[in-house]
């Protein structure tokens, strides 16, 4: 336990929290251009072909972002909006692409959880 005098001289040390999304530079989302769109396989107990894209952000950094939902229209030079949020079974994928904004269209025929996939309300 420090004395009052020690606290006056040195003060308390602030703990610095390391960010999980450094490429966003403390913004909620960032715009970027797809440089490569491809599929990759997840870690050990799971098996699939996960759709991911390599994106060059406006901050100048290049990140790997996950494309959520069933089917997508993204290709090289597509302009996308990237948010934070990792994919647990894909190592190195710490960002998600926001569906339904810029060049990324929303998921077709989506009835539930539509707001996460940029899908309009069905008529």
Curated annotation (Swiss-Prot):
Region of interest (Disordered), residue spans: 1-32
One GO BP annotation of this record: translation
Keywords, alphabetical: Methylation, Ribonucleoprotein, Ribosomal protein, RNA-binding, rRNA-binding, tRNA-binding
Cited InterPro entries: NA-bd_OB-fold, Ribosomal_uS12, Ribosomal_uS12_bac
One Pfam short name: Ribosom_S12_S23
GO MF term list: rRNA binding; structural constituent of ribosome; tRNA binding
Gene Ontology CC, one term: small ribosomal subunit
SUPFAM superfamilies hit by this protein: Nucleic acid-binding proteins (SSF50249)
UniProt modified residues of type 3-methylthioaspartic acid: 89
Matching PROSITE patterns: RIBOSOMAL_S12
PANTHER family (UniProt xref): 30S RIBOSOMAL PROTEIN S12 FAMILY MEMBER (PTHR11652)
Function comment: With S4 and S5 plays an important role in translational accuracy. Interacts with and stabilizes bases of the 16S rRNA that are involved in tRNA selection in the A site and with the mRNA backbone. Located at the interface of the 30S and 50S subunits, it traverses the body of the 30S subunit contacting proteins on the other side and probably holding the rRNA structure together. The combined cluster of proteins S8, S12 and S17 appears to hold together the shoulder and platform of the 30S subunit.
Family: Belongs to the universal ribosomal protein uS12 family.
Quaternary structure, from the entry: Part of the 30S ribosomal subunit. Contacts proteins S8 and S17. May interact with IF1 in the 30S initiation complex.
HAMAP family tied to this protein: Ribosomal_uS12_B
Protein name in UniProt: Small ribosomal subunit protein uS12
């Amino acid at each position: 336990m420090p004395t009052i005098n020690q606290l006056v001289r040195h003060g308390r040390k602030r703990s610095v929290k390391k960010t999980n999304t450094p490429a966003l530079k403390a913004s909620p989302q960032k715009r970027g251009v797809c440089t490569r769109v491809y599929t990759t396989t997840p870690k050990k107990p799971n098996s699939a072909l996960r759709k991911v894209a390599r994106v060059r952000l406006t901050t100048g950094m290049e990140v790997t972002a996950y494309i959520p939902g069933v089917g997508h229209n993204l290709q090289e030079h597509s302009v996308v909006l990237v948010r934070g949020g990792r994919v647990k079974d894909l190592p190195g994928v710490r960002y998600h692409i926001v569906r339904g904004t810029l060049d990324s269209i929303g998921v077709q025929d989506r009835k539930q959880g539509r707001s996460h996939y940029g899908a309009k309300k069905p008529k």
